[in-house]
Amino acid sequence: MDNEIIVRSMHTVEKEKACVAGMPVKDTIKVSDELGYSANTPDRKSLWQIQTPQCFEYDLLAQSYDKLFSDMSYGKSVPAITDDAMIVEYGSDTKVKLIEGSYENIKVTTPEDMGDCRTFFKETQKNVKKLEISVDIL
């Protein structure tokens, strides 16, 4: 994650109360039925893969968590939560603003994601070494 994404997120949350970085999906996404068949294909234009940072006004996030935990303690059915943005969507009427992140901003969710991370960091290190060498020659 680069500083520019963090700064844009901080500025956005000042205006919007809630924002997450992400990128439009590149892949076709299928929704499956309970038997594993394709039920439909949503329009890719409306789908984003969400990354970090996820930024919220503190009180908004705290109140959203309170509602979630309260509902759970009373045995209410709640969705399977995958990130803080989902908690804000569940626990408030506030819309979460999507801002552009970077396809290089890798979100580590599964063990397989660690391989992507390692590859990215190896490539980054190669570029840093090249830069250091060119600076040393000057």
Task: Annotate each PLM feature.
Residues 15, 35, 93-95:
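A generic structural signal for alpha->beta connector loops
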Residues 49-138:
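Conserved alpha/beta core of the MobA/IspD/sugar-nucleotide pyrophosphorylase nucleotidyltransferase superfamily
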Residues 10-11, 38-40, 88:
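Short secondary-structure boundary/capping segments
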Residues 31-56:
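Short, flexible, basic/aromatic active-site loop/helix in glycosyltransferases
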Residues 4, 32-34, 108-113:
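Short secondary-structure transition/capping segments
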Residues 1-32, 51:
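Conserved beta-loop-beta/alpha segment of the NTase-like Rossmann-fold superfamily
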Residues 11, 44-45, 96-98:
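Short hydrophobic/aromatic segments of transmembrane alpha-helices and their interfaces
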Residues 1, 23-25, 44, 52, ...:
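Fold-independent oxyanion-binding glycine-rich loops
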